[in-house]
């Protein structure tokens, strides 16, 4: 699960894709993006839905939901958000976190199971520790911007990203989760 959260964090860090140096590829990335990664069948990776706001001055913001559905009533879920400085050179996105946070938002069954199981409590502690580790303050990943400029493929996870649209259903879902957890 450590790898899952680190991968999720890498995707979340996309929040700063336009280059401060004004390179045209970086400028093409400026705007709002929704990225989605579907978990593997072995449940070793999280289903991720991330929203990035990429500013042309090299600053950015992000928020997202990472989850694994264990069964219909048991979902392990984390809400993440943060601010970054970013740069894109030669199809490699690099970013530095300015701040970040992760909040558990598990289903009631998952929260109950974690509360009653020392091993699960330790795993969650390790995940949160990994998330906040200074070693994750700087991340680099390869990117591929599709020719029309409205689609993006990120890193080894091959998360697919698209530009945010008006009345976007994924933005509404994120708003619901982040407004609930205030």
Describe each model-derived feature in a short phrase.
Residues 4-14:
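Sec-dependent N-terminal signal peptides
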Residues 17-89, 94-182:
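Lipid interaction determinants
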């Amino acid at each position: 699960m450590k790898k899952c959260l680190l991968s999720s964090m890498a995707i979340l860090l996309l929040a700063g894709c336009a280059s401060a140096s004004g390179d045209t590829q970086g400028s093409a990335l400026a705007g709002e993006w929704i990225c989605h990664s579907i978990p593997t069948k072995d449940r070793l990776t999280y289903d991720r839905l991330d929203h990035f706001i990429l500013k042309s001055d090299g600053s950015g913001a992000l928020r997202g939901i990472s989850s694994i559905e264990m069964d219909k009533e048991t979902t392990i879920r984390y809400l993440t958000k943060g601010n970054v400085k970013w740069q894109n050179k030669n199809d490699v996105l690099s970013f530095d976190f300015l701040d970040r946070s992760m909040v558990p938002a598990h289903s009631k069954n998952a929260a109950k199971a974690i509360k009653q199981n020392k091993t699960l409590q330790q795993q969650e502690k390790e995940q949160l520790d990994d998330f906040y580790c200074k070693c994750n303050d700087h991340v680099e990943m390869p990117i591929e911007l599709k020719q029309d400029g409205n689609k993006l493929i990120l890193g080894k996870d091959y998360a697919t990203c698209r530009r945010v649209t008006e009345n976007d259903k994924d933005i509404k879902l994120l708003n619901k989760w982040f407004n609930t957890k205030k």
